Amino acid sequence: MTLTLGHFLSLGAMLFALSVIGIFLNRKNLIVLLMAIELMLLAVNMNFVAFSYYLGDMHGQIFVFFILTVAAAESAIGLALLVLLFRNKSNINVDELNSLKG
């Protein structure tokens, strides 16, 4: 059995749907929300790689490296902010972080 473009796109769609479900079902823990957002970015990256491979164009695969770089920086900044919130509030639940409201 060979893997076709449809297999990769369906896997990417399933990963994207799983991350959306993770965002909607878990609205309490910020770390799990950050992980769900990262899973969403990885699903989109997988679709970019699949399309660029099957079209014979390297631009999609090069674009994925830029997206992964930005995602790594986003994760590092997000985790640093979560560590600061945990140090100040000793809690990272979304419901109890109402001091951030403007």
Swiss-Prot record:
Keywords: Cell inner membrane, Cell membrane, Membrane, NAD, Quinone, Translocase, Transmembrane, Transmembrane helix, Transport, Ubiquinone. NDH-1 shuttles electrons from NADH, via FMN and iron-sulfur (Fe-S) centers, to quinones in the respiratory chain. The immediate electron acceptor for the enzyme in this species is believed to be ubiquinone. Couples the redox reaction to proton translocation (for every two electrons transferred, four hydrogen ions are translocated across the cytoplasmic membrane), and thus conserves the redox energy in a proton gradient. Gene3D superfamilies: 1.10.287.3510. NDH-1 is composed of 14 different subunits. Subunits NuoA, H, J, K, L, M, N constitute the membrane sector of the complex. The lineage of its organism: Bacteria, Pseudomonadati, Pseudomonadota, Betaproteobacteria, Burkholderiales. The gene is nuoK. Belongs to the complex I subunit 4L family. The chain crosses the membrane at residues 5-25, 31-51, 62-82. Its EC number is 7.1.1.-. It is a multi-pass membrane protein. Pfam families: Oxidored_q2 (PF00420). It is found in: Cell inner membrane. It catalyses: a quinone + NADH + 5 H(+)(in) = a quinol + NAD(+) + 4 H(+)(out). GO terms for molecular function: NADH:ubiquinone reductase (non-electrogenic) activity; quinone binding. This is NADH-quinone oxidoreductase subunit K. One of its GO terms (biological process) is ATP synthesis coupled electron transport. One of its GO terms (cellular component) is plasma membrane. Its main location: membrane.
